[in-house]
């Protein structure tokens, strides 16, 4: 369940939100997605572009629980096809957001928006 109060994703809009869990950390300052080739992830990006054409506001949320990082990027060396489709989706108007989360026994709480690095 996501509470979207005061966020970039207004509840009144027709939003579609794809959530990706980010676990890859190769550089101590940058979280990355994907950690393996993801044909399914690429398919989802294409569906979000189609949803945009049908009047929806599509978002992809990259969420990580890796503490101390302030940056995120697509691991294009792992899945170049996903990276290319990410760029197409972004240019088409799909919105991409990345957040660092705090994890506890009771909840996962969004802590901070982090930068998305496009290489």
What do the predicted segments below correspond to?
Residues 7-8, 40-44:
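N-terminal-biased segments
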Residues 16-18:
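Short hydrophobic-acidic sequence motifs that mark active-site Asp/Glu residues
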Residues 65-119:
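Domain-level recognition of nuclease-like catalytic cores that cleave nucleotide substrates
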Residues 1-6, 10-11:
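Single conserved hydrophobic/aromatic residue that forms the stacking wall/gate
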Residues 20, 26-39, 46-78, 100:
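Nucleic-acid nuclease catalytic cores
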Residues 12-14, 55, 98-103:
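Surface segments flanking catalytic/ligand-binding clefts of nucleic-acid enzymes
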């Amino acid at each position: 369940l996501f509470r979207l109060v005061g966020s970039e994703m207004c509840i009144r809009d027709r939003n579609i939100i794809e959530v990706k869990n980010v676990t890859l950390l190769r550089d101590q300052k940058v979280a990355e997605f994907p950690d393996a080739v993801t044909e399914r992830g690429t398919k989802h990006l294409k569906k979000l572009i189609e949803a945009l054409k049908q009047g929806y506001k599509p978002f992809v949320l990259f969420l990580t629980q890796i503490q101390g990082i302030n940056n995120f990027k697509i691991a294009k060396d792992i899945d170049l096809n996903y990276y290319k489709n990410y760029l197409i989706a972004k240019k088409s108007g799909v919105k991409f957001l990345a957040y660092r989360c705090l994890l506890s026994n009771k909840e996962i709480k969004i802590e901070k928006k982090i930068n998305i690095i496009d290489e």
